[in-house]
Design a protein with these regions (language model features):
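Short alpha-helix boundary/capping and kink motifs at helix termini
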Residues: 1-111
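Intrinsically disordered, low-complexity segments enriched in small/polar residues
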Residues: 47, 147, 207-208
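Charged/polar, solvent-exposed surface patches and flexible loops
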Residues: 81, 85, 126, 179
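Extended catalytic/binding region for NAD+/ADP-ribose chemistry, centered on the ART fold
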Residues: 111-118
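Short active-site loop/helix that positions an aromatic residue
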Residues: 118-131
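Charge-dense polyanion-binding interfaces
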Residues: 132-160
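Long, compositionally biased intrinsically disordered regions
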Residues: 162-219
Length: 219
């Protein structure tokens, strides 16, 4: 997942540098990354957001230097200021998470989509420092029975209708990698945040390694 997501991550972070304000390449939602989630994807007309909804009852901890997180800074000057002043040894100090940072985690691929705090998040990603906790989680698994990516387009399975033709190939590749992960029982190596403070911390991905589970077992 990470090698495929890396070019997309670089594009979304840097596109503001050569675009007008609000003209950056957006990847801050399911619809921007894959296809409009309001489109019907089942024979009976169910829409993508109805069968793959965002849930806020689970939290995962993403490492900005390791886990693929897509930030979309939209203003060149704000991006330049964040990169110049946020980080270890810089004026604002090391990057740290705050309430402005909002990230939706896509499972099973373990990719975070930033929809709040994009400029400072871009600095954390560029510096490879800090952690961010997901705001909500969206599981793509229910979509795999109804949607596929054929290398060019996202298509509905039941009638072959085109849902979108993404500008970049990486979103489609990530979508299909997720299908393979589901078929083979491989989970993303992101750290689950236990809602019970007294509970033992999860070890699903630490600072020094990237844990992969196959059929529930550490590979």
């Amino acid at each position: 997942v990470r090698p495929v997501a890396a070019p997309l991550q670089a594009k979304t972070i840097t596109s503001a540098a050569h675009a007008m304000p609000h003209g950056a390449s957006w990847a801050d939602s399911f619809s921007c990354l894959f296809f409009q989630d309001g489109l019907p994807v089942t024979p009976d007309g169910q829409r993508a957001y109805e069968i793959s909804s965002r849930r806020s009852d689970q939290r995962f901890r993403l490492r900005l230097g390791i886990d693929p997180v897509l930030a979309t800074p939209w203003h060149r000057d704000r991006l330049a200021n964040a990169l110049a002043t946020i980080g270890f040894g810089k004026r604002q100090g090391p990057w740290s998470e705050d309430g402005n940072h909002l990230v939706s985690l896509l499972l099973p691929i373990g990719v975070g989509i930033v929809f709040g705090g994009n400029h400072s998040m871009a600095a954390g990603i560029a510096n490879g420092e800090g952690f961010v906790t997901s705001t909500d989680v969206q599981d793509l698994t229910p979509l795999y029975s109804h949607v596929r990516y054929d290398g060019l387009d996202f298509l509905r399975n039941h009638d072959g209708a085109q849902l979108s033709q993404p500008e970049d190939e990486e979103p489609g590749m990530l979508f299909e990698i997720g299908r393979l992960m589901v078929e083979r029982g491989v989970a993303a190596g992101v750290e689950y945040v236990d809602p019970e403070p007294a509970a033992a911390p999860s070890m699903s991905g630490g600072d020094g390694y990237y844990k992969v589970l196959i059929n529930g077992q550490d590979a």
